[in-house]
Amino acid sequence: MEQPRIVNLNELPPATDREHGEKFASSHVPIGAPLGARKLGYNLTEIPPGKRAFPYHFHHVNEELFLILSGTGELRWPGGTAPLKAMDLICCPPGPDSAHQIFNNGSVPLRYLALSTTEDPEVVEYPDSGKYGVTVGRKLGGTPAESKFRVIAFKKDQVDYFAGE
């Protein structure tokens, strides 16, 4: 008989920290594997004051949901910005109308639970920079960099289908 799939967020392993430039910093604790998840991805994310976890983006395939646990912040989306506080839920279905970015505009860390479908392959677009990313073969709980195939490029650098053939 299987054991219940229960994980206490206060008893998770240490977070993996990510930082890039002046704008981006966050820590992430994957919780899908400890839960035994098979079709959904979960992680606990914390963003320090004045930072963002990720660039403004949207997914073509996967849907995301965020539950703000503590702190305050701001959601950037195609319609502008919206304030965030503890117990707010944010749903981001696939598509450009759900482009999103969470910014910690508060004075304490912003913590949230991130939940997503894990369909593969995935295509993500970054409207601010004109980039896109494609991943194929990403393992549940793995990072995009660990995918079997991954490319991040500028859309303007596209080539003709037969180029180089």
Where are these regions (language model features)?
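Ligand-binding loop in jelly-roll beta-barrel domains
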Residues: 95-122
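Short acidic-glycine-tyrosine-enriched beta hairpin
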Residues: 79-95
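Short, conserved beta-strand element in jelly-roll/cupin
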Residues: 44-48, 59-77, 115-119
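A generic structural motif
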Residues: 53, 63, 70-72, 79, ...
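A short, N-terminal "cap"/entry segment at the start of jelly-roll beta-barrel domains
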Residues: 1-39, 125-165
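Conserved short histidine dyad/triad with adjacent acidic residue
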Residues: 27-30, 43-59, 97
